[in-house]
């Protein structure tokens, strides 16, 4: 309908003087150059003859015009198509509304314009509104195009595929003393996994419940030489290797302590004996009491090396769940009691932090080859797999189990279910046959910057 409007040949330079400063809405200036505001003004003045039809026509035209402009219809419907009556009504009654409505949309230099020109510009106001929104549409389109990239980057903050028991076990096994307080467990998890830096109250409740309701975790009270708040948590010495070869994705079996009553009786005997006992010595005393027939005759600090070592050894050799419930006498024939010197040595190693880093654990649990001491009274038979790691080279050997960054292991979008051995998110893993280490061991650049100590150990 724009072709029906007669454009007279007035010079557009008269209106260009009003646009000396840069325009906020460049589309209005383009309309000024293309349509010619003088032509619109003269057309509006020429339409004054059509107002002779009476005020009813003008009011109808003004109402029609206001409804069009208020509804945000296209300017061709609002300013062009209704005809002379509607245009006159716009120039008369809707002119003031056009001036008021165009205030925030147009340059302030348009204020000296007459009512008719302001009304004509009011008819063009929807152009400015639509064009001012067009950059927003463009930005929205660009942001939608960028969304997949940001979503892909957020995979490093995805929820790790480990259970809370696995996370607690990781934290305890990497600590030098094999025991941590509750706050230290929280901090270790948040340092290693960015996902757990939010919604802390939820998952920390789950961590506390896992510590309380699983027999594989033991609460160790603070000793006088370690003042502070909160007790320590450690792994049960009889729980064995719950995670095969350091794979923390799934436990082999749930550790269930079936001798709670025997533990209480052993605790009473230990308190009456007057000597300190290790957290795991009570269970071994109960097993020794069943084997010998009298738990009260066993000294409080005395452990039978067979009773404490045989469940873990049998479990590592592929023993089934019935080995935990069976008495110690059913596993192997009884062996002679240890000498007092060996008892003191075992109690010292079980109670305190490691003082002999040169003593090696069993050979098939470590990638490095060391001499294995298979003597029945050696330190290997007196300690479980968790405590044996006290005597490994913490500061002189390379990391045996370095946890790997998600984005380097998982190779998204494959997810956690990728069939590669690196989906376990662990470093080198060796089995009993002495296979070569996984080639993913050297790539630990992400989390080593966060946590400089050895992050994970297989034993």
From Swiss-Prot:
Pfam families: Forkhead (PF00250), Forkhead_N (PF08430), HNF_C (PF09354). Restricted mainly to endoderm-derived tissues (lung, liver, stomach, and small intestine). Expressed in epididymis with region-specific expression pattern: no expression is observed in initial segment, low expression in proximal caput, gradiently higher levels of expression in middle and distal caput and highest level in corpus and cauda (at protein level). It comes from the Eukaryota. Residues 268-281, 340-353 have a biased composition (Low complexity). The modification Phosphoserine is found at residues 212, 284, 304, 307-308, 310, 438, 459. CDD domains: FH_FOXA2. A motif (Nuclear localization signal) lies at residues 106-113. The modification Phosphothreonine is found at residues 156, 302. Disruption phenotype: Embryonic lethal; absence of organized node and notochord formation, which leads to secondary defects in dorsal-ventral patterning of the neural tube. Mice deficient for Fox1a and deficient for Foxa2 in the endoderm from 8.5 dpc onwards do not show hepatic bud formation. Mice deficient for Fox1a and deficient for Foxa2 in the midbrain from 10.5 dpc onwards show almost complete loss of mDA neurons. It is found in: Nucleus; Cytoplasm. Its main location: nucleus. Residues 295-311 have a biased composition (Polar residues). Binds DNA as a monomer. Binds TLE1. Interacts with FOXA1 and FOXA3. Interacts with PRKDC. Interacts with AKT1. Interacts with TET1; this interaction may recruit TET1 to specific genomic loci to mediate their demethylation. This is Hepatocyte nuclear factor 3-beta. It comes from Mus musculus (Mouse).
């Amino acid at each position: 309908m724009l072709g029906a409007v007669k454009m007279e040949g007035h010079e557009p330079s008269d209106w260009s003087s009003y646009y000396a400063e840069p325009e906020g809405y460049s589309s209005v200036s383009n309309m000024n150059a293309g349509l010619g505001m003088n032509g619109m003004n003269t057309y509006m003045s020429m339409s004054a003859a059509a107002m002779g039809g009476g005020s009813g026509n003008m009011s109808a035209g003004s109402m029609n015009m206001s409804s069009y402009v208020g509804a945000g219809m296209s300017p061709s419907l609002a300013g062009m198509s209704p005809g002379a009556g509607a245009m006159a009504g716009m120039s008369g009654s809707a002119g003031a509304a056009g001036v008021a409505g165009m205030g925030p949309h147009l340059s302030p230099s348009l204020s000296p314009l007459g009512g008719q020109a302001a009304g004509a510009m009011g008819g063009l106001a929807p152009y400015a509104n639509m064009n001012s929104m067009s950059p927003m549409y463009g930005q929205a389109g660009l942001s939608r195009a960028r969304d997949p990239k940001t979503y892909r980057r957020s995979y490093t903050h995805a929820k790790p595929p480990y259970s809370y028991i696995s996370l607690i076990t990781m934290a305890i096994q990497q600590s030098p003393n094999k025991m941590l307080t509750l706050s230290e467990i929280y901090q270790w998890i948040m340092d290693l996994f960015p996902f757990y830096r939010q919604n802390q109250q939820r998952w920390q409740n789950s961590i506390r419940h896992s510590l309380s309701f699983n027999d594989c975790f033991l609460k160790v009270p603070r000793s006088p030489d370690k003042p502070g708040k909160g007790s320590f948590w450690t792994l049960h010495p009889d729980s064995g290797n719950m995670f095969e070869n350091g794979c923390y994705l799934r436990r082999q079996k749930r550790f269930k302590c079936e001798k709670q009553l025997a533990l209480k009786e052993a605790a009473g005997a230990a308190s009456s004996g007057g000597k300190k006992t290790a957290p795991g010595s009570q269970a071994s005393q109960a097993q020794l009491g069943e084997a010998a027939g009298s738990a009260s005759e066993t000294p409080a600090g005395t452990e039978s090396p067979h009773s404490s070592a045989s469940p873990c050894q049998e479990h590592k050799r592929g023993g089934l769940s019935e080995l935990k419930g069976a008495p110690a006498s059913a596993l192997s024939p009884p062996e002679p009691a240890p000498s007092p010197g060996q008892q003191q040595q075992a109690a010292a190693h079980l109670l305190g932090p490691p003082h002999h880093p040169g003593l090696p654990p069993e050979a098939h649990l470590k990638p490095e080859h060391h001499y294995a001491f298979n003597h029945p009274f050696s330190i290997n038979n007196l300690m479980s797999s968790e405590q044996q790691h006290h005597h490994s080279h913490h500061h002189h050997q390379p990391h045996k189990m370095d946890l790997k960054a998600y984005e380097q292991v998982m190779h998204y979008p494959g997810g956690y279910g990728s069939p590669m051995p690196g989906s376990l998110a662990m470093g080198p893993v060796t089995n009993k046959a002495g296979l070569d280490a996984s080639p993913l061991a050297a790539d630990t650049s992400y989390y080593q910057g966060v946590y400089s100590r050895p992050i994970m150990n297989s034993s």
